[in-house]
Amino acid sequence: YIRDNNVYIASSDKNQGEEVPLSIDGTFDCFYDANLIWSPDSKKIATLKTRQANCRRIPLLESAPKTQLQPLLHWRNYAKPGDVLPVSVPVLFDVEHCKQIPLDTRGYENQFSLSLTGWREDSRGFTFEFNRRGHQQYIVGEVNAQNGMIRHLVDEKSDTFISYINNYRYDLNDGMEILWMSERDGWRHLYRIDGKTGEVKNQITRGEWVVRKVIFVDAGQQRIYFMASGLNKKEDPYNQHYCCVNFDGTGFQDLTPENANHKVILSKDRSYFVDVYSRPDLPPVSVLRKLGEKKVIATLEKCDISDLKAQGWQMPEVFCAKGRDGKTDIWGTIYRPFNFDPSKSYPVVENIYAGPHDSHVSKDFNPIEWSSSSLAELGYIVVRIDGMGTNNRSKKFHDVCWKNLKDAGFPDRIKWIQAAARKYKYMDTSRVGIYGWSAGGQNAMAALLFHNDFYKAA
């Protein structure tokens, strides 16, 4: 437990001795973390020691506190870009001998984050993950519980940035092997790493497509089940498919081959799954499948939208056009109002969110996509677009955002809207507006500041 910023141990039986300090150097500004992780054999403890930084503070006003009539002022630490950040380092205690085992933590100072990720089952050591500030290096380290030596199991580096939000790690055989997600070949794929040497044993998936999410790992069968997108060249590259592959990279299967965005629900034993697939222009279909087989066992339900159509509802249109380089496909969706009349001229509004952490245009069927369809009902053609600089395409596509957030994919977005207007004459590109929330609000302001020859209002 932690008391006065230091680590103490004591018997659960109060009659068996006094508390013993394992550390004595903890202070208010340089303290030991309360997350104390015991080794499985109960002989060691791992935790973090954190050195606080002199941080800016911002005031927050609670207008109607329960404790008093007057508003209440609170202060919160709030670092700004470029400020010094807190630094955490791993710490190892030997409980049997009531001492701290020294670790060489030089090299981990300039950090965005450092977190402990648990002990090995045999108590030989524990692991941590280190994200260097600037996101150009990401390390998985292992601390030897006997001598405190640190070795790097994964040392991921990038000349631009590592998309750490997409990191995936799965330790096999108590860390003898590691399954790891990386964009090191230009696309987000899975690798098998030797847990002793840190060397790549083999690349598990490869190709001009991306692994989106690992669903589960069957260690016994040495098989991985995951969602992937971009598999089929003639399909929207953001559509997700449920796939599987062996650890050695053989036996790849797309278990959900329909041209759509798939969501799966597994049975408890994972031998069957419900596949619900749709697109913005395809109502949902729910089918039952058996794991490892492409064929459909039963169609469970098909969405009937005849009543929607009878009311004049307009199906959103998935649209693709070339981006700024004249080569790269840019994908988005067009929304039209219920009373749409192709003989009229309509102003265009882009609903934007260009945050680089993800892609943002919905790929599912949604008859009332409130942020777009509601605006369309006011008499606009509304568009949503994933331009360069957003996630879930190639690393090159994503890297456009690096040190360049103001770009927000605008050269691609403008090309896309112009291409749509050439096809649909009712889209009036002399009247283009834009709006968004959060990062989308920043993007909307950037549109007026840097591209006001095209965007007229925000």
Located regions from the model:
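Short loop/turn segments that connect beta-strands within beta-propeller blades
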Residues: 12-15, 94-98, 144-148, 195-198, ...
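Serine-hydrolase catalytic core recognition
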Residues: 115-116, 123, 129, 261-458
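Structural motif
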Residues: 4-8, 54-60, 87-89, 135-142, ...
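Conserved beta-propeller blade repeats
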Residues: 1-2, 27-45, 74-83, 87-89, ...
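Short, solvent-exposed loop/turn and secondary-structure capping segments
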Residues: 5, 10-13, 48, 55-61, ...
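Predominantly five- to eight-bladed beta-propeller fold
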Residues: 19-37, 47-103, 292-308, 360-371
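N-terminal targeting or regulatory segments adjacent to alpha/beta-hydrolase or S9 domains
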Residues: 48, 55-56, 214-306
